[in-house]
Amino acid sequence: MKVIIAGAGKVGTMLTRKLLAEGYEVVLIDNNQQVLETCTERYDVMAVRGNCASMETLEEANVKKADLLIAVAGGDEYNLLCCMTAHGINPNIHTIARIRTPEYGEQIYKMRDVFALSMAVNPERQAALEIERILKYPGFLRRDTFARGRAEIVELKIREDSKLCNVAIKDMNSITKSKVLVCAVRRDGVVSAPDGNYILKEGDRIFVTATSKELTGMLKNIGVITHKVKRVMICGGGKLGFYLAQQLSKGDIDVHLIEQDMNRCIELSNHLPNVSVVCGDASNQMFLESEGIEKCDAVVAMTRFDEMNMIISLYAQNYNVDQVITKVDHTENSRIQDILGLGSVVCPKELCSNQIVRYVRAMESTTGAALSIHSFADGQMEALEFRVDEETLHCGEPLKALNLRKNALIACISHGKLPEIPDGESTFNVGDILVVVANGDVVLHTLNDIFV
């Protein structure tokens, strides 16, 4: 399959890396020669310099024979024109555009056919929804749902006083009094798929699969006290700050939004009547004290600068704020969380690229292909949802008898409406849904790819 990526920024480069790794043919368009040279030195990709929305440039990229065009260049209008032009040249092409302006949201949805769009993605809105999910379920750093919401993969940090500290994974269920499965552990930035003898240490981040009911019991039994978030401080009034404040203010949460630019504060106040908008420097510790940071249930740092967001998050942790969420734009910075001991880290660009990759995979979906794909642990691991069909191997055989690929495991089996966290005796049959966790380097196009 041939994919054209218009725009070689952070998202475009991230998509180039991911799609090339999966064997897709990629053509990259950008008007910056230096950026293109950097990409061609790093990746085996064809590069075309020029205006992404220009018919001449798109024809040079051979858009007539392309299956998909992804427009993640400059402004929204530019991306839309790029998609419309590509569709004009090749009516059969799929098109994806990044649209970030809040005012365009509903309009794009209603006029998708007019703009010749197969899908529109909004990194900031997607990140806002992800952060809202984290705030709704305190106690976890991250939470992804599968099997129509009946099973989940959550991220927890092992603290010094945790009941799980210095405990072998095989003994974990006796402590949590819940049936859970540890599918991955991140220690010092390195992610591994542990066995039962793996000893959990302070600072480890563990990724646990369980049903929603079992997770609730797990938190209670390991002594993690959770309470509903009532007061949130958002530091940064950009698009992401606006989307998050808008979402949270729909409920009964007291939202305080801090922004340094006065004109932007006025604009935010006009659009967010139920939000307390304050003009000030969120990187100033005394200012945060004056705004009552110590009284907040959660602090979300989402300024334009990763370094400032990390400083704000460290301030919040110093005041013992229960939930601290840090936005990063550079994915390599998300790994610093292990060093600094930060809480939840959200990367809008990573979420956006993952959503697009899921669409690309769905375009090529075949019998046994993944129904959904979620990346976690900084993209080093993936959780894939498969439906068992007549072509699936080893139906009815106990899991302990199967030979799976290295760094791949079956984390959940959903029998109709009944999810099961499997053990060696578990089996699956036609119609069941499997959640498979695998190393991000392991490409699983079909369910049968997990078997050796």
What are these regions (language model features)?
Residues 1-452:
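Cytosolic regulatory regions of ion transport systems
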